[in-house]
Amino acid sequence: MKVAVLGAAGGIGQALALLLKTQLPSGSELSLYDIAPVTPGVAVDLSHIPTDVKIKGFSGEDATPALEGADVVLISAGVARKPGMDRSDLFNVNAGIVKNLVQQIAKTCPQACIGVITNPVNTTVAIAAEVLKKAGVYDKNKLFGVTTLDIIRSNTFVAELKGKSATEVEVPVIGGHSGVTILPLLSQIPGVSFSDQEVADLTKRIQNAGTEVVEAKAGGGSATLSMGQAAARFGLSLVRAMQGEKGVVECAYVEGDGHYARFFSQPLLLGKNGVEERQSIGKLSAFEQQALEGMLDTLKKDIALGEDFVNK
């Protein structure tokens, strides 16, 4: 199984590469690409870690050598948020980067499963889909927006609030991956109940957690380490499912039946070819139902922005 990380010299990319080097199954190949000249050196650095994962690094304008034979491609390339920016301010720079990289994927490894980490995910996934469609290689079961950071944050914050072990809490998060489009389904956590105020406060904290990190880093970056962990969790789940492990479920942002929006994050059963089954979002509380209805306009606008960027 070959995994390629695009944007591997950045804060997320390096953290992700480290976790994949130490956690991918024995015999896997890890391929690192970034425009930055340091990238082959990042691979050399990681190659000294004693695991049975072969690693190579590539830099420059052309990602082709890194993509050849890739089964999974994780895209973390792009600029990070600074204080005062929201994820959509990133659009102008990151849209072009994602478009370019996905065009190269469409040429070199069109069968690969793709996980898009680059923000704004609500929009960059739509860009990726349209690029793949234009190239005639789009498979909606193989393109994912990685929203796992919202899930791990939810797990952490709920565990803190309720005095539970963070490893025992699993919160489904649906919708999108910015602001009001992030909807943690707090009503669906077994054996945990919340007051209305706790639900309102927790939901808001989960939605604004990225800003919390941006502000705490005081202009020195955004959430890179927790995002690296989240992306690794998603990538490793995908690899395990593609290698035949049964019952692997992760939430991610994918094209579904369009019931809520063309792209929507929901629980997915993963399999050998990506998404095996889009699972139901289950029964929502009144608060969740209202939040869901309230986000759809924003989500649809974010998606249209990406579609128009490719098709204009």
Swiss-Prot record:
The active site is at H177 (proton acceptor). Keywords: NAD, Oxidoreductase, Tricarboxylic acid cycle. It is an enzyme of class 1 (oxidoreductase). The keyword tRNA-binding does not apply. InterPro entries: L-lactate/malate_DH, Lactate/malate_DH_C, Lactate/malate_DH_N, Lactate_DH/Glyco_Ohase_4_C, Malate_DH_AS, Malate_DH_type1, Malate_DH_type1_bac, NAD(P)-bd_dom_sf. Its EC number is 1.1.1.37. GO terms for molecular function: L-malate dehydrogenase (NAD+) activity. Belongs to the LDH/MDH superfamily. MDH type 1 family. This is Malate dehydrogenase.
